[in-house]
Amino acid sequence: MSGLGARDIGHRVVVRHRIPGGLTDVIGVLQSWAPDSLTVRHADSSVHEIRAVDVTAAKTIPEMPLRPVDVEQLFLATALGRPAVETSYVGHWLLRASSGWTGRGNSLLPAGSPGMPVAEALKHTEAFYDERGLPPQALVRLGSPEAEALRSSGWVDARPSQSDVLVMHTTLDHVNAAPPYDVLVAEHPTDAWYAAAFDGPVPEPAPAVLEGAPNAVFASVTLDGQVVAVGRGSMTGHWLGIDAIRVDAGYRRRGLGTAIVQGLARWSGPLGGRRTYLEALLENTAAMATYTRLGYREAYRYRYLTSR
């Protein structure tokens, strides 16, 4: 096979092979190799099985460099991938409320112009949250003009003891390998999914938030007759957002979280998914190590600010 072998499994390759009427090239990750055939996984998650007798040339090629991300676009995509129960706008600023469940679902997302002086926009923001009995909070991208504007207006850290939240990204071909477990991807979460996702009762606003995106799915792995790992995926354009990953304490360090990511990546490929993002607290060293090993890199960091 022109130099490819089992040692190249997991590496990026190009394979030229015969098809009816001519030759074609397949570029992707070498997923399996045998003396009589090989399989290549394309970036869109499709798998190409090629007979050895049809291969005319094949070689490893360098990893595709991770292109710089459009941070502003990703900042907005994260909000669309997990929409709040209630939303309102002040210019381009997005106000979100979800009965207090999660910071993302109950905070201002200041992106772009509010269409009025910042001080006036912040008064609208405080009124919005006061009317709902919620503390006024803003999710701000560190280093952004909006973050500086809010701090200059007297807004301070809402969670000073918590580390920064990292939004991390990579291309789909880094994470769409075949998972080592059977990953079920469903359009609707089951009671067993929710039981695995939460300790104790499910917060009342959670289903509306988690199921509110127009193109969201719910992944799970079942072992020993019980759901032991779950996660959620949502598509916004070519972006796959992954969140709500949770693994039962008795089943950790077995690659189940990685399997959930891979299962969701393989679901999104045929739907046009090309890039993926997720979030992790900087202090969550185990998650950071896993995601970095999978090829995720930091896009930006955020914190929550409050006026009180």
Locate the predicted segments by residue:
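Acyl-donor-binding surface of acyltransferase catalytic domains
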Residues: 81-84, 94, 101, 118-195, ...
